[in-house]
């Protein structure tokens, strides 16, 4: 299980994170709930749930979202210890948030003898209840303290979010392949990794193209070459990050026998 399923899913998560999907999830959560009472804490909960779909790691989830949400919560008026607790609790839910869950979910599928897709489907309701409980807690705390949200004019625009929604295509592909049973788990992860590489290439190209003043054949070609180089570097970085992440899981699997 460790070498056929878990490692590939960890590598896929590393590739997907480098496409910029974490920033997209944070911006989406910011737009969705940032305006409400105690908005930054709700942003932390929603963004941690969304990023947990990709990482399956509590620590990685905290590092990704916490660097943005914790300072924002403190600035809004939450106590530092409460802000840290909210982020830690929300990020821990990444272990049980499908489709990419913690290593324990893969081991459950192996030992019980049921497909991983069934484990992921059964985890949807508990995961939603978990994050709903945290969301209600931060809402009640915000009402008790009388905290406001983020002004609407400072929130990301829906139009810009819609432009970047292509970043979630590899995740959608993975969910479809796993749920439909069209491919094996290993093949599903491999195809999703290739999709993440393609999406990352497009994202790098778009970023470089946006930084150019004029759109000529030369500038577009230069942006394409630069994006290819950025994508190649991202592939090596993703493989390195995936390998490092797999070491911890491999040790846990070895201890479990």
Where are these regions (language model features)?
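Alpha-helical transmembrane segments of multipass membrane proteins
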Residues: 49-50, 92, 103, 107-111, ...
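Hydrophobic transmembrane alpha-helices that form the pore/transport pathway of multi-pass ion
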Residues: 27-94, 100, 104-105
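Helix-coil boundary and interhelical linker segments in multi-pass alpha-helical membrane proteins
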Residues: 109-125
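Long, contiguous bundles of hydrophobic transmembrane helices that form the permeation core
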Residues: 121-241
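Membrane-interfacial loop-to-helix junctions in multi-pass transporters
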Residues: 1-4, 31-44, 76-82, 162-168, ...
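Hydrophobic alpha-helical transmembrane segments in multi-pass membrane proteins
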Residues: 5-9, 39-40, 48, 94-103, ...
């Amino acid at each position: 299980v460790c070498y056929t399923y878990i490692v590939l899913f960890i590598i896929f998560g590393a590739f997907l994170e480098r496409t910029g999907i974490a920033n997209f999830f944070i911006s989406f959560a910011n737009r969705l709930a940032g305006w409400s009472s105690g908005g930054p804490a709700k942003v932390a909960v929603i963004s941690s749930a969304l990023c947990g779909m990709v990482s399956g790691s509590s620590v990685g989830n905290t590092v990704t979202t916490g660097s943005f949400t914790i300072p924002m919560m403190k600035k809004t008026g939450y106590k530092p210890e409460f802000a840290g607790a909210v982020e830690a609790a929300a990020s821990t839910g990444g272990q049980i948030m499908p489709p990419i869950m913690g290593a324990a979910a893969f081991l459950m599928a192996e030992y019980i003898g049921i497909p991983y897709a069934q484990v992921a489907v059964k985890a949807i309701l508990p995961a939603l209840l978990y994050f709903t409980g945290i969301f209600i807690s931060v809402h009640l705390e915000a009402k008790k303290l009388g905290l406001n949200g983020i002004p609407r004019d400072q929130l990301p625009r829906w139009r810009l979010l819609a432009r970047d929604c292509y970043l979630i295509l590899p995740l959608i592909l993975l969910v479809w392949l796993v749920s439909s049973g069209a491919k094996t788990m290993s093949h599903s992860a491999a195809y999703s990794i290739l999709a993440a590489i393609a999406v990352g290439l497009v994202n790098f190209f778009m970023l470089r193209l946006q930084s150019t003043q004029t759109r000529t054949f030369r500038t577009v070609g230069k942006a394409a070459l630069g994006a290819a180089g950025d994508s190649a570097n991202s592939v090596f970085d993703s493989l390195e990050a995936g390998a490092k992440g797999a070491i911890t899981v491999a040790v846990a699997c070895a201890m479990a026998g």
